[in-house]
C-alpha cells in the first residue's frame, strides 16, 4: 500500500513539474512577444518601413512568428487606421518606383525625399533634362546649404555622405586653400588649388567643385567652435561659387542675384594669406573675442561676415531674388529653401506621422506637438509655451504693452486679433 502511494506521488510530481516548465515557457514567450510589440509601436514610419523590408526569416523561431512580425511592421509602416487606401497605394507605388530606378538616379531622387510618386517623377524628369544626366551628389541649390553642410537634425533615408580621408580639422584647413588668383585678370586664368582643378572647358564652377563634407561620425568629433568655423568656411566657398557663376553665366540653377559681383568686390586671396587669418579666427573662438560691432544696435560678432549679414536687418537689404515669383531674401539659405517650394520638394519629414515640411526649423517646431516639449518660459509666472511668438504675446499681460493701434480712434490693443475685431465696429 505504501509503495503504491509513493509511486502515485512520484507520477503526480512528474506531471506537475512538466506543467510548471510548460507554463514558465509560455510566460517567457508572452513576455518577449509583448516586449517586441512595444518596440514595434515606438518605431517611426520610416524606421518601420526599413525594418519591414530588411526582415529575414531566420529572425523568427517559427513561420507563424515571422508572419506575425511582418504584419506588425507593415501595419506600423502603412498605418491603415489613419491613412486612406489611396494614400497607402501611393506609398507602395512610390517605394517600388524608387527601387526600379537606376542606382545613380535612385540615390539622387532619394536625397530629395519625395512623398508622392508625382514628386519623384518631377525629380527624375528634371534630372534627365540637366546636362550630364544622372548625378551622384546633390548641390547646395537643390537641398539648401544647411541641408548639405550640417544636417544636424534629420537626414533623409538614402542620404550618403562623401567619404573622408583626413582628420576633420585638417580637412577644414585644407579646403581654405581653394583658389589662387594669378597675376592675369582674364577669366580663364582663374586657377584651382591642388586636388580641386577647374578644367578650362568647364562652363560653370559649382558649389560641389569646392565643397568639403564630413561623415556623421566626423561631425560628432568637432567641437562647437570648429563647427562654427566650418560654417564660415563653407559660406565663403558658397558665395565664391555664386560670384564666379555670375561672372560667367549670370545665372546659377535658376537663381539670380539682385546685385552683381565683381572681382574687385570678391577678392580671392592665396592660401598663404588665408591660412594665418583662419588660425587667428580659430584662436579668437577660444578667447571669446568679438571685435566686430554693429553701430546701430551694439551687437558684437566674432567674424566680419556675420556682422555684414546682421546689418542687412537694419538696412532691410535683400540681395537674393527668386526668378519665378520675384520674392527677395536677405540670406542665400532663405532663397535656396524657398526655391524648393516651387519644385514641390519638402526635404524634411516628421518621423511620427510622415508629414512633409519644407524648413528644418518648422520641423523642429512641429515635432514639439508630439514630444510635448515647451522650451519657452515666462520668467514672471513660470508658464511655458511651445512657440516663442506665443510667449511674446502672453508677456504683454504682465508688461501691459499694447503695440496695435486703431488708425481711426487711436485705441491700443495687445493682440492683433483684438484690433481686427475692434475695426469691424467702425
Curated annotation (Swiss-Prot):
This is Putative zinc finger protein 75C. A zinc finger (C2H2-type) spans 292-314, 320-342, 348-370, 376-398, 404-426. GO terms for cellular component: nucleus. Belongs to the krueppel C2H2-type zinc-finger protein family. One of its GO terms (biological process) is regulation of transcription by RNA polymerase II. PROSITE patterns: KRAB, SCAN_BOX, ZINC_FINGER_C2H2_1, ZINC_FINGER_C2H2_2. Residues 205-289 form the KRAB domain. May be involved in transcriptional regulation. One of its GO terms (molecular function) is DNA-binding transcription factor activity, RNA polymerase II-specific. InterPro entries: KRAB, KRAB_dom_sf, SCAN_dom, SCAN_sf, Znf_C2H2_sf, Znf_C2H2_type. It comes from Homo sapiens (Human). It is found in: Nucleus. SMART domains: KRAB, SCAN, ZnF_C2H2. Its main location: nucleus. It comes from the Eukaryota. Pfam families: KRAB (PF01352), SCAN (PF02023), zf-C2H2 (PF00096). Keywords: DNA-binding, Metal-binding, Nucleus, Repeat, Transcription, Transcription regulation, Zinc, Zinc-finger. Residues 49-131 form the SCAN box domain.
Amino acid at each position: 500500500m505504501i509503495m503504491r502511494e509513493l509511486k502515485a506521488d512520484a507520477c503526480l510530481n512528474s506531471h506537475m513539474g512538466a506543467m510548471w516548465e510548460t507554463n514558465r515557457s509560455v510566460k517567457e514567450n508572452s513576455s518577449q512577444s509583448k516586449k517586441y510589440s512595444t518596440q514595434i509601436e515606438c518605431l517611426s514610419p520610416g524606421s518601420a518601413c526599413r525594418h519591414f523590408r530588411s526582415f529575414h526569416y531566420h529572425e523568427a523561431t517559427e513561420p507563424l512568428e515571422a508572419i506575425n512580425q511582418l504584419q506588425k511592421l507593415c501595419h506600423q509602416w502603412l498605418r491603415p487606421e489613419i491613412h486612406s487606401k489611396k494614400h497607402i497605394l501611393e506609398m507602395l507605388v512610390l517605394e517600388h518606383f524608387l527601387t526600379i530606378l537606376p542606382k545613380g538616379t535612385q540615390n539622387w531622387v532619394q536625397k530629395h525625399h519625395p512623398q508622392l510618386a508625382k514628386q519623384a517623377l518631377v525629380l527624375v524628369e528634371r534630372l534627365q533634362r540637366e546636362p550630364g544626366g544622372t548625378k551622384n551628389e546633390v548641390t547646395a541649390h537643390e537641398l539648401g546649404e544647411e541641408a548639405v553642410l550640417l544636417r544636424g537634425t534629420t537626414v533623409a533615408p538614402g542620404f550618403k555622405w562623401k567619404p573622408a580621408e583626413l582628420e576633420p580639422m585638417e580637412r577644414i584647413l585644407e579646403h581654405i586653400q581653394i583658389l589662387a588668383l594669378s597675376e592675369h585678370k582674364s577669366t580663364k586664368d582663374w586657377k584651382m588649388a591642388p586636388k580641386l582643378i577647374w578644367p578650362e572647358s568647364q562652363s560653370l564652377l559649382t558649389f560641389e567643385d569646392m565643397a568639403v563634407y564630413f561623415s556623421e561620425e566626423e561631425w560628432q568629433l568637432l567641437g562647437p567652435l570648429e563647427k562654427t568655423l566650418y560654417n564660415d568656411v563653407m559660406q565663403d566657398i558658397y558665395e565664391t561659387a555664386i560670384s564666379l557663376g555670375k561672372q560667367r553665366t549670370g545665372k546659377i540653377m535658376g537663381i539670380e542675384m539682385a546685385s552683381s559681383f565683381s572681382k574687385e568686390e570678391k577678392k580671392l586671396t592665396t592660401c598663404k594669406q588665408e591660412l594665418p587669418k583662419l588660425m587667428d579666427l580659430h584662436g579668437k573662438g577660444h578667447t571669446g573675442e568679438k571685435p566686430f560691432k554693429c553701430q546701430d544696435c551694439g551687437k558684437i560678432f566674432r567674424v566680419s561676415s556675420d556682422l555684414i549679414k546682421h546689418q542687412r536687418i537694419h538696412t532691410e537689404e535683400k540681395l537674393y531674388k527668386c526668378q519665378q515669383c520675384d520674392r527677395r531674401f536677405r540670406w542665400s539659405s532663405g532663397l535656396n529653401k524657398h526655391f524648393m517650394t516651387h519644385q514641390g520638394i519638402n526635404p524634411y519629414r516628421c518621423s511620427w506621422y510622415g508629414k512633409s515640411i519644407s524648413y528644418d526649423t518648422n520641423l523642429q517646431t512641429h515635432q514639439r506637438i508630439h514630444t510635448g516639449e515647451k522650451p519657452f518660459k515666462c520668467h514672471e509666472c513660470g508658464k511655458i509655451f511651445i512657440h516663442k511668438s506665443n510667449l511674446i504675446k502672453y508677456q504683454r499681460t504682465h508688461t501691459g504693452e499694447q503695440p496695435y493701434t486703431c488708425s481711426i480712434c487711436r485705441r491700443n490693443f495687445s493682440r492683433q486679433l483684438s484690433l481686427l475685431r475692434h475695426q469691424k465696429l467702425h
